[in-house]
């Protein structure tokens, strides 16, 4: 199941892969409440990294400077676990969510003067 690591994964494939991994290596899913706590921890790690990268604080040491992609992948893994636990098809949910945003915000952001780029910036 892990052989072709260079192939692009669809969301559906990723959900199946995560389920396989949990059943094979994790024994079972953590409870939803535990996964919620783990998700908050992982989002906190992303926030801490981005704060150090773009905010006023520097990294305390070089070992602390983790790759953003790895931290975001941790978030996606836990979100996928929660989706699997609740029978949510992430591909369908994301498409429906994007359709909703497109319908709702079709002109809202374009007309927002705060988002317009000023010349010279």
Regions found by a protein language model. Give the residues of each.
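Flexible "arm" and connector segments at domain edges
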Residues: 1-72, 76-121
């Amino acid at each position: 199941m892990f052989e072709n690591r260079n192939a692009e994964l669809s969301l559906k494939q990723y959900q199946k892969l995560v389920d396989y991994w949990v059943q094979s290596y994790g024994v079972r899913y953590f409870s939803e409440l535990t996964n919620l706590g783990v998700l908050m921890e992982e989002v906190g790690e992303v926030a801490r990294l981005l704060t150090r990268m773009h905010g006023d604080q520097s990294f305390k040491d070089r070992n602390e400077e983790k790759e953003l992609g790895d931290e975001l992948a941790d978030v996606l893994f836990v979100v996928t676990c929660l989706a699997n636990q609740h029978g949510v098809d992430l591909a369908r949910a994301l498409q429906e969510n994007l359709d909703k945003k497109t319908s709702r915000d079709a002109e809202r952001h374009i007309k927002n003067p705060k988002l317009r780029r000023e010349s010279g910036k």
